[in-house]
Amino acid sequence: MKNIQTLFQTLNITPQNLTLYKQALTHSSYSNEQNPPQEDNERLEFLGDAIVGLLMADYLYSQSKEDEGIMTKKRAQAVCERSLTIYAHNIELQNYLLLGKGEKNKDFNAKSIIADTFEALFGAIYLDLGYLTAKKVFHNIVLPHLAKTIYIIDFKTQLQEIVQSEKKTIQYKIVQEQGPAHSKNFVAEVYLEKNLLGTGEGSTKKAAEQKAAQQALSKVAKPKDLLNNKGGKEKELQ
């Protein structure tokens, strides 16, 4: 196990309650081998899971105007076990873990253990230094790696980039809105001049527009075929 002070330097924090961090790094397999047993990181993991999810939601909400569905998918990808393991390895968190002999003999770098410890660490930071410090640490060690963990396809942006490359414009139109206020369904159409390129449905206007753009892109073998009227049909845009 590396000196925990090195971890604090990496995180750029000055802890007030060292016990919290030692607990965050203590796996239950190690705790159970001690006499008397030490407190493990499972409770901090429970708290940290909520903190990490909140920090990612906070970031996504503040940085974009995307609809709830897209942000939910992005958050799920950014804080899944695979993603948390990537962030943890970048600060070499696996080198600070206290594991029991049995776990060491199995797989010291088990993703689930490392991801859980990452969450426990943020639980400790939050309890010790507060939300704003946890947010600062999160931004420093997570945001640089989001490109590796978030892979939502933004079909509207793809379509817009294709059209803008030829100095043309597209328009979206909501043509149908059904259902009660708490369970709406929208139908959107996307046009290039008078050509209808695609139609899509969704629970929000933006989601329907995404589906319309996706359909437009799926109709052609090559993206630029859209500009040559190979993917659309003429329809008067009202």
Curated annotation (Swiss-Prot):
Keyword Hydrolase: yes
Keyword list, A-Z: Cytoplasm, Endonuclease, Hydrolase, Magnesium, Metal-binding, mRNA processing, Nuclease, RNA-binding, rRNA processing, rRNA-binding, tRNA processing
Extent of Basic and acidic residues compositional bias: 222-238
EC number: 3.1.26.3
Reactions that this protein is recorded to catalyse: Endonucleolytic cleavage to 5'-phosphomonoester
Domain DRBM positions: 154-222
Cofactor(s) this protein cannot do without: Mg(2+)
Positions of the UniProt region annotated as Disordered: 215-238
UniProt-annotated catalytic positions: 49, 119
GO cellular component: cytoplasm
Top-rank lineage group of the source organism: Bacteria
Major location (coarse): cytoplasm
GO biological process, one term: tRNA processing
InterPro entries, A to Z: dsRBD_dom, RNase_III, RNase_III_dom, RNase_III_sf
A Pfam family recorded for this sequence: dsrm
Domain RNase III: 4-130
GO molecular function list: double-stranded RNA binding; metal ion binding; ribonuclease III activity; rRNA binding
Matches recorded under PANTHER family: RIBONUCLEASE 3, RIBONUCLEASE III
Record-given protein name: Ribonuclease 3
Protein's gene: rnc
